[in-house]
Amino acid sequence: MNKINRARREFLQIGAAAVVTVILGNLPKNGFGQSPPNVTKGFVVHEDEGLHILTSRRKLPMNIKISKTNNGVNDISFSVEDMSVGRKMRVHKHLNNDELIFIHKGEGTLTLDEQTIQVKTGDVAFIPRGTWHGLDNTGKDNLLMIFQYSPAGFEEYFIENGTLVGMPAKEKTEEEYAIAEKKYGMVYKDSNASK
């Protein structure tokens, strides 16, 4: 595929993510459509900006673009994770947050309650709070995942337990992780924290 077609496809994929965000932003009673009183002007977070962290136990890179703490946005967050080939996300659920996952690039297998669904570039998954889910990169290349929580807040789990890129890694006990998981309403389906 030539560079023009690739650039066009990436532009359309990003546009699709924006359309989904706008549509869901206007749905009633799910937290997306309410503007926080302290955010009165729009803003842009550029490609190289955001909070670049290494996640808690496995020290995987992610970029939190919009968060409750850093941007004052209460109703939705926005993050990006580049999942390496073979990476498996533990099956878990969020008790307090709905989640949207957009597969910007790559392919994988999404667990959604008892279903196993193949996903690829351009696919979007809506995961209501309380739904078991996980994502495995089964492709030959990295999987670029864009994800959002509504209401915002769960991204703070990554901030609290992760490490800013370039800083010494935070070391926590399994008991400390369990306390944070309870605080942010995350439950793992299995009890093996080393996964």
Predicted regions and their residues:
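N-terminal secretory signal peptides and thylakoid transit peptides that target proteins
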Residues: 1-19
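Double-stranded beta-helix
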Residues: 136-195
